[in-house]
């Protein structure tokens, strides 16, 4: 390592000075010296147990639950019927628990939630991702459009039944006020309960943050991918949620209409950019870790992402400074032995190799640029710089025999590789470290942890 640093220091005189952008400290990674993690959150237990198909997740540096199950010690996802008494209307039109949050007992919900958390996550030292997937309604009145407008209508009727003497205008204002108050209490108190019971977990809501940049279907070549200003403003109003979250879980799912297109990168980039913005404003001591949800196949299909779109999703997420990416999948992945083999083939091909490429490159950059005390982040978020192994310097080798399969990365950084990293990336130091290259130990910052 010493000779690498000598070369690195010698190269400084040829490089531009640091661009002066302040980067908030990050929470230390979930696993030591693993600045970028890839999780598997798909129900593929049947592949292993029923069809005897090993997807080789660990071989390709993927963090998964025991037996590749949907929930476990690495990541647990709570759907509406898994946590408490979540009031909602499901996709089939069935009513649950009073439908709207102001028509259900919060105390009853929290008591049931406590029981559910103890049952689903029995390990008190749980250190994984705790993801609450409540998508039926949004806590902000103005965001309940389309099919979610039913929650506004129900809230108006609820207020009218309680206060028939009020004018229609006052009823609407009261309905909005009471709905948002109750929705906030349900979401906030549920989060705080989970964090109190399993304090070492990374807790947050799936699809928070969002930025509503879905207009690629109508804009075509005019699509910019940028989050509408009104949606960014609405995200600012959710500061109460960001402050009580310990992780953010935006999604970067690609529909097949975006396959290998410029619009795909625009879509993903701006969603991540908004998530990183929110992560930096949530707390004063460190930026929240961001774990982007992605799919290894295009949304609503069983067609694997192209190599270009692996870069668009996994590569972009790592380069933007996220803590990791979570691959979600449906029951289709494990529905038959053929579907399991299809996932395995993709894992042993482009998907697995690219994951090894990015996770290894992120570790190398953290080591040589940030002394393992921070993660590498693009200096300019809109650039096209990626954390990739340099093909002229590294090779990914897969070895397999009758008993095991392993991946080995061979190679070493050359001077020009170091120069590229220094020119295009900067360090986001973990708590307790500061300096341009996270070289300074800070007792003051450690005390905040």
Swiss-Prot record:
It comes from the Eukaryota. InterPro entries: Aldolase_TIM, Glycoside_hydrolase_SF, Hyaluronidase. Expressed by the venom gland. It is found in: Secreted. It holds the Pfam family Glyco_hydro_56. Glycans are attached at residues 67, 103, 111, 153, 357, 401. Its EC number is 3.2.1.35. Keywords: Disulfide bond, EGF-like domain, Glycoprotein, Glycosidase, Hydrolase, Secreted, Signal. Residues 1-23 form the signal peptide. Gene3D superfamilies: Aldolase class I (3.20.20.70). GO terms for molecular function: hyalurononglucosaminidase activity. The keyword Glycoprotein applies. One of its GO terms (cellular component) is cytoplasmic vesicle. The active site is at residue 135. Residues 427-438 form the EGF-like domain. Disulfide bonds join 47-340, 211-227, 365-376, 370-427, 429-438. Belongs to the glycosyl hydrolase 56 family. Monomer. Snake venom endo-hyaluronidase that degrades hyaluronan to smaller oligosaccharide fragments. In venom, it is not toxic by itself, but increases the diffusion of other venom proteins by degrading the extracellular matrix. In addition, it displays antiedematogenic activity. This is Hyaluronidase-3.
